[in-house]
Amino acid sequence: MKFRKWIGMLCATLMLCACTTKEPVKKEKKKVVSIPKPVLNTENVSAVVMDADTGKVYYAKNEQESRYPASTIKLLSALVAIDYYKDDDELTTRNIMSLPDRVFIHTAPVYDGERIPFKDVIHGMLLKSSNEMALTLAENYKGGYDGFIEAMNKRAKKIGCTKVDVSNPHGLSYADKGWLKETCSTKDMALIAKEFYKNKKLRKIISTESYVFESNPNREMKNVKMTHKDSTYYDKRVIGGKTGFTNLAGRCLVTYSKVKKRTIITVVFKENTRQETYTDTKKLLDYVNDLLAA
């Protein structure tokens, strides 16, 4: 009996020793990698970088400030138009001569009374940044021009925009035309771009490298320079985008890019030069690439 008790005590002691001498498992601390934010070319620039699928914001600077969006507002015009028109709808051009800036004026000018398929009109507005085509979308809309502008502002609010206030479909800003309230923050533009990218047709158009009007082969257009392999601004990550410029807005650029299998939206407003929009966009894409790789 004593022998059994002694054996039991010995076993218990050995087990206790084994437990106390076992080294605790050390948990490896996850290394925190600090990625420096890029220094952009212009101090007053407004910029946002957003994931097109999740809405996650990777970078923001002056993102809530109201700015003039120039022709980037045509992304919002496209959202309204794509829900109303069909590809084979023929639209009639009106009031073309009222535009102070006409992009087709030197190559195959647009005149009042032309009948142009919606497919040509939407491509012309997004790829050529044609103010004539933006005006045509508004003039043929239900409720006419004013109805289109109202629909743009309503759609912006529905998306969640808080600083959008548009008075025309093309983004021009002229005091004598009453076009000085055309405002939008870069945060709002990123939300518009995100909503835009959800639409399969618009996504295809914005990623088209070049397009020729079916109704007039002399009207040809190309996407932003960052998609052109022969351009000094070429970046293989960039799928497509929308440029913008007025004296009040400065240089603006919205792009869609693929970074680490994610679709990334970049928005820059109020740059001094076209070159700055491209170089800052590249810096922002490099920054997101480093963040996703960390």
What are the language-model segments listed below?
Residues 31-44, 143-294:
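Penicillin-recognizing serine hydrolase domain
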Residues 21:
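Short, conserved catalytic or interaction motifs in soluble domains
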Residues 17-18:
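C-terminal motif of bacterial Sec signal peptides marking the signal peptidase cleavage site
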Residues 7-8, 149:
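Hydrophobic face of alpha-helices
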Residues 1-7:
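Bacterial N-terminal signal peptides that target proteins for export
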Residues 24-187, 197:
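Active-site-adjacent loops and short helices of periplasmic peptidoglycan-processing enzymes
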